[in-house]
């Protein structure tokens, strides 16, 4: 069974993707940056249930780390045929006039450069033009790329807009090389992202603005990602699927 790599796999949407994939018999490389304890606990959970998984540390904004991540995953778990780019940073909620250059650089380094580097390594290994057997890439974007994030995180929204554009371009570039590239665009999802951005009450505060009147769950997003990774949507590439409760 081909391996999938899940960046940002130690928590939230990424962790749920890893759980669902392993339940289907797929070996999973669980990437983490700092939360080693959570990543190793997830791997232990997967292995205890009969799955195969490995926790791998990397800073996806650093080229050498990304190459090492993919090389190790392939060596320890088998050929890589799936990539989920779930890792991302938000930074503090703030208006544009208060954003620092350092904050901008970090958001774009991880959300954009990190995503592109991971996709590059996936293509090098999965593309039939490079001797691979094909595969599927799913980038985790955000509904913020469409609505702009005004008053909260315009800089984050802009980084996800870049992810959307990249997804469309890469999908067309590798369409005849056996690789499908899509993105999911979650709305407000019940993860720790909001607390990390300094707004622990954001889920409750924003719920009334959602037509379904509730935030989504990591499981709901992960199910869509697993579907895109599967062979079921064989004719779908270059799509950005919104998972926002109608927002």
PLM regions with names:
Residues 214-243:
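C-terminal substrate-recognition "lid" of short-chain dehydrogenase/reductases
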Residues 142:
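Residue(s) in the substrate-gating loop at a strand-loop-helix junction
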């Amino acid at each position: 069974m081909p391996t999938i790599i899940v960046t940002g796999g130690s928590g939230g949407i990424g962790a749920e993707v890893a759980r669902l994939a392993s339940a289907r018999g797929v070996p999973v490389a669980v990437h983490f940056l700092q939360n080693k304890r959570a990543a190793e606990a997830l791997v232990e959970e997967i292995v205890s249930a009969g799955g195969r998984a490995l926790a791998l540390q990397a800073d996806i904004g650093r080229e050498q780390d990304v190459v090492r991540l993919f090389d190790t995953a392939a060596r320890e778990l088998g050929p890589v045929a799936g990539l989920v780019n779930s890792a991302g940073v938000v930074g503090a909620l703030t208006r544009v006039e208060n954003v620092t250059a350092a904050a901008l650089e970090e958001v774009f380094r991880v959300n954009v450069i990190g995503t592109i580097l991971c996709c590059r390594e996936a293509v090098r290994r999965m593309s039939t033009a490079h001797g691979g057997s094909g595969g599927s890439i799913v980038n985790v974007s955000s509904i913020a790329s469409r609505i702009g994030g005004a008053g909260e995180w315009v800089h984050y929204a802009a980084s996800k807009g870049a992810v959307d554009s990249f997804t469309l371009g890469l999908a067309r570039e590798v369409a005849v090389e056996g690789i499908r590239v899509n993105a999911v665009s979650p709305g407000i999802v019940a993860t720790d992202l909001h607390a990390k951005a300094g707004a622990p009450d954001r889920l409750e505060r924003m719920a009334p603005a959602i037509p379904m009147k509730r935030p989504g769950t990591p499981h709901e997003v992960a199910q869509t990602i697993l579907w895109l990774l599967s062979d079921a949507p064989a004719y779908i590439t270059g799509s950005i699927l919104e998972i926002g409760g109608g927002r």
